[in-house]
Amino acid sequence: MPSSTAMKHQDIGWHFDNTYAQLPGHFYTKLHPVPVHEPRLVIVNNALAEELGLNFKASSEDELAQLFSGNQLPEGAEPLAQAYAGHQFGHFTYLGDGRAHLIGEHLTPDGKRVDIQFKGSGQTPYARRGDGRAALGPMLREYIISEAMHALGIPTTRSLAIATTGESVYRETVLQGAILTRVASSHLRVGTFEYLAAQEDKAGLKQLTDYAIQRHYPEIIDSDTPYLELLKAVMACQIKLITEWLRVGFIHGVMNTDNMAVSCQTIDYGPCAFMDNYDPNTVFSSIDHMGRYAYANQPRIAQWNLARFAEAILPLLHENIEKAAAMAEEAIQSFKALFQQEWLAMMRRKLGLFGEEKEDMEFITGLLQWMQRSHADYTNTFRDLMDEHFPEEPHYQDQEFKHWYDRWQQRLEHNTKPFPSSLCLMGATNPVVIPRNHRVEAALNAVEQNADFSKLHELLDVLSEPYKDKEKYTEFKNPPAPKERVSQTFCGT
C-alpha cells in the first residue's frame, strides 16, 4: 500500500501557511490521511483551481489521483483532524472530523486564505464508530450542489476534486469509495466554540475566538467589545445566508450547530435539496422526522444555533456573567426583526420592487399563500412573472392569482425606477435553473450504475450559468413528473 508522503508541486502553485496548526494541540489531532490502494481521478474543478492560483494541467491523471486521494501530499501540507462538538437535532454531543483531514491553509495569489480539506480520507480519533470513508455518490452530490450554490451567488464551500479510492464502503449496500477535496474560508464551526466551552477551557476559548476575529472579522479587532461584535457580525451574515437559501428554495436538511460556519459559508451538503412546488413545510432529509429543519423553519433554527454560539462565548462577553448573559440576550433577540427586514428586501427583489410600501409584507405573503394552495413551482413562478404578458399556464387562470397579479401591476407603477429596471432586478434574483433533485439523482444514478458521466457533466454545465435562459436549459427548467419526484434525501455518512 502506498504511504501518505509529501511530494513537490512547485509547478502547481501550492502556497501553504498553516495558522490553525499553530493553535493549542487539543484543538486538533495531527495525522495523515489513511492511504488507499488504487486511486483514480474522477473530476477536477479547473475553474476553481485557476481562482486559487493552482494549475493542474501539467500533472498526469495518476499524479492527481495520488494527490487528491491523500497518498502523496503537497509540500507544505500539515494534515490534521479538527476537534469540535455540536447540537445535533437539539442534543449536545462531542464530534470532530471523523473522516476528514484539513491538509492546510493555501494562500491564493491575491492573498486570500482558504482551507484545503479532504473528506472521506480515513479514520481519525474522532471517528467514533465510523469507518472514516465516503461513497462516490454523496461526494459527487456535494460537488454538484456546492458549485451550483456558488454559481447562484450564495456563500459556500467549494469542491476542487474527487478521486475514487479503489476500495468499497459499506452502507445499506456496497458502494464505491471516494474522497472529496473541499475548499473553505475556514472550518470554524459554532460547534468548535462549543467544544472548548463544554470543557470550561476559557483560555483556549479566548485563543480560538481571537483567531476567528483575526481571520474573518479583522475590522472589529480594535473594538471595545470585540466578542460581542463577533456575535453580532456572525448573526448578521448568517441572516443574509439563510435569506439567500430561501431565495432559491434551498433546504439544508441538517442545520446542526457543527454545520454552521462562523465564516457564514454554506457547509456540509448531506441531505440537502431544493424545493419544487412551494410549501414552507417541505422536508427532504430522511432523518428529520419532526421537520425541525424544514424550509420555513431554517431562520428559527439559525437563531437557535446563534444562541448556542452566544452561550459558548459568554465568559468572554463580560467578566460579570449576568451582564454577559444580558448582552447576549439582547443581541439574539434582535434576530427576528433583522431577519424580517432582510427577507422582505429579498422578496421585493424577486418581484422587481423598488422602494418600500407598508402593504408589501401582506402583498408578498398573499402570493406565497396562493403558491402553496395551488402547488405552484417556486422557481418557475417568479420567472413566469417576467413574461411581457399575463402567464398562460392553466394554474394562473384562477381569480385569486389574477387579483394578485393586478395588485402587482399597480405596485410596479409605484416603483422608484422604470419597469425595465424591475425586469433586470428580477432576472438577477430569480434563477432559470436550480439543481432539481430528480436531475441530481439521475446524474448520480448514471455514474453509480453505468459509469456514465455524461449527465453529470451536462448538469454541471447547465448549473454554471443559472440566470441565463438558454434553449438547451428547457428540460432542466421543468419540475419533476410524479414518477420522478424525490421525496427523501440521505446523509451518506
From Swiss-Prot:
The gene is ydiU. ATP binds at G96, G98, R99, K119, D131, G132, R182, R189, D268. This is Protein nucleotidyltransferase YdiU. Signal peptide: none annotated. Its cofactor is Mg(2+); Mn(2+). It comes from the Bacteria. Belongs to the SELO family. Residues 471-493 are annotated as: Disordered. Mg(2+) binds at N259, D268. Its EC number is 2.7.7.-, 2.7.7.108. The keyword Metal-binding applies. Nucleotidyltransferase involved in the post-translational modification of proteins. It can catalyze the addition of adenosine monophosphate (AMP) or uridine monophosphate (UMP) to a protein, resulting in modifications known as AMPylation and UMPylation. The keyword Nucleotide-binding applies. Coiled coil: none annotated. It catalyses: L-seryl-[protein] + ATP = 3-O-(5'-adenylyl)-L-seryl-[protein] + diphosphate; L-threonyl-[protein] + ATP = 3-O-(5'-adenylyl)-L-threonyl-[protein] + diphosphate; L-tyrosyl-[protein] + ATP = O-(5'-adenylyl)-L-tyrosyl-[protein] + diphosphate; L-histidyl-[protein] + UTP = N(tele)-(5'-uridylyl)-L-histidyl-[protein] + diphosphate. It comes from Nitrosococcus oceani (strain ATCC 19707 / BCRC 17464 / JCM 30415 / NCIMB 11848 / C-107). HAMAP family: YdiU_SelO. One of its GO terms (molecular function) is ATP binding. The lineage of its organism: Bacteria, Pseudomonadati, Pseudomonadota, Gammaproteobacteria, Chromatiales. It is an enzyme of class 2 (transferase).
